[in-house]
Amino acid sequence: MEAFAAESGGMPQLNPEFWVSQIFWLIITFGILYVVLSKLILPKISANLENRKSQILENIEAAEKQREESEQKIEEYEKIVQSSKNEAKNYFKQAREKVLKDIGVKREILEKELDEEVNKAEIEIKTFRDNAPEKIKKIAVETSSDLLQELIGAEVNSSSISAIVEDLSRKKMDEYYGN
């Protein structure tokens, strides 16, 4: 065979006398390859692709469900937060109103007490003012009597001292009160 290939001088694959056997074996090889691919490998690949496709679709559906659930949870959370804010505002408003009401009540009580104290003080001042001249006159008469008794050494008539003090105090009262 070596001699034949060397004599013919070329590649044996391109020799036309071997083409029939080459085509035969080529058809058998590709036929077997086709059968193996179509019956064994391609169904496995196709099944694998279908599994992947179904898994992807399931994952997409699960993701959609989770997205919807998360949106629903977010809406519930926002409702809860909003209701909590409203509740807090109501509590704050009620507390504020209560405090303002308590302050108002205490202010009224305090104003009444202050008015009562002012009225008492005015009454005391008026009473003192009304009684003060009499007491001052009495003290002035006693003091003047004692002083004159010390100076003169004799008993002094208290009615004359009283008349003098009365006259002087009337003049001072007229000056003071503008009568």
Curated annotation (Swiss-Prot):
Its main location: membrane. Pfam families: ATP-synt_B. GO terms for cellular component: plasma membrane; proton-transporting ATP synthase complex. It is a single-pass membrane protein. One of its GO terms (molecular function) is proton-transporting ATPase activity, rotational mechanism. Keywords: ATP synthesis, Cell inner membrane, Cell membrane, CF(0), Hydrogen ion transport, Ion transport, Membrane, Transmembrane, Transmembrane helix, Transport. The chain crosses the membrane at residues 23-43. InterPro entries: ATP_synth_b/b'su_bac/chlpt (IPR002146), ATP_synthase_B_chain (IPR050059). It is found in: Cell inner membrane. It comes from the Bacteria. Belongs to the ATPase B chain family. F(1)F(0) ATP synthase produces ATP from ADP in the presence of a proton or sodium gradient. F-type ATPases consist of two structural domains, F(1) containing the extramembraneous catalytic core and F(0) containing the membrane proton channel, linked together by a central stalk and a peripheral stalk. During catalysis, ATP synthesis in the catalytic domain of F(1) is coupled via a rotary mechanism of the central stalk subunits to proton translocation. Component of the F(0) channel, it forms part of the peripheral stalk, linking F(1) to F(0). F-type ATPases have 2 components, F(1) - the catalytic core - and F(0) - the membrane proton channel. F(1) has five subunits: alpha(3), beta(3), gamma(1), delta(1), epsilon(1). F(0) has three main subunits: a(1), b(2) and c(10-14). The alpha and beta chains form an alternating ring which encloses part of the gamma chain. F(1) is attached to F(0) by a central stalk formed by the gamma and epsilon chains, while a peripheral stalk is formed by the delta and b chains. This is ATP synthase subunit b. It comes from Pelagibacter ubique (strain HTCC1062). The lineage of its organism: Bacteria, Pseudomonadati, Pseudomonadota, Alphaproteobacteria, Candidatus Pelagibacterales.
